[in-house]
Amino acid sequence: MRTEVLGDTGFKVSRLCIGTDYADVYGGSSLGRDILLEGFSLGVNFWDSSESYGSYPAIKEALKTLDRGDVVITSKTYSKHEDGAKRHLEEALRETGTDYLDVFMLHAVDTLEDFKNRRGVLGFLSEAKGQGLIRAVGVSTHSANLALALADVPEIEVVLAVLNMKGLRIHGGNVELMHSALKKLHDVGKGVYLMKVLARGRLGDRAEEALRYAFKIPYVHAVSVGIQNLSELETAVNVEKVADIA
């Protein structure tokens, strides 16, 4: 498994990131833990989570057998208010059993107005970073327009954005603009990784082709793929192995 440095954060991450947005897999069963640990044995050290995913139990169990510094863990908050974000961060730390998160993100920010409305939360996250509770601040977005604007926001160090070979689920722009935005983010030192490369299953019948498309983008550090079983993990790992960087 190839690795990349996640922009100016300096975090060394695997090109494949395990997306954990399946509460039935990562919430209560041992399967989620097994996926994370098997992925780690295959070189996957990057785990994407959120307060809304219900995946903290699997992360906590997996961390019991790993050194915390060997994995990069993200989480997110939908909250538009500081008290809600504080609660979500405290919950993430408590339920994963760790003292810090590598990246904590404003979740699903899809317009500039929404981003401006979350400035208070951004200020809180910057304070939390200063306290060592998080190591980097990020934003997840479906919007190409917002992704482009984030290149000029110094507080934002990591961007998780929607991109897939059919341009599905992109708001505020199109595939071409999203590519331009991600390249600019990459070039100014932001960490860049992708979500919804299979468009929440709509490209499932072309999964390997869709994964190759994502892994070949040279200005993307990692690709988050929702993994529901060990077979899907194996497929994603194998595609990453043979995907040539264009």
Residue ranges and their predicted role:
Residues 1-70, 213:
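N-terminal binding-site loop/beta-alpha segment at the start of enzyme catalytic domains
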Residues 6, 18, 47, 59, ...:
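Conserved, mostly hydrophobic/aromatic
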Residues 7-10, 41, 59-70, 90-99, ...:
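Acidic (Asp/Glu)-rich catalytic clusters
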Residues 11-16, 43-46, 67-71, 98-102, ...:
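Short, well-ordered coil/turn segments that N-cap beta-strands
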Residues 24-29, 48-57, 78-85, 112-116, ...:
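Acidic-and-aromatic substrate-binding clefts and catalytic sites of carbohydrate-active enzymes
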Residues 25-39, 82-97, 142-149, 205-213:
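Short, acidic/polar
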Residues 86-105, 127-131:
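CE4/NodB-like, metal-dependent polysaccharide N-deacetylase domain
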Residues 109-246:
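Beta/alpha (TIM)-barrel catalytic core signal, keyed to glycine-rich beta->alpha loops juxtaposed to Asp/Glu
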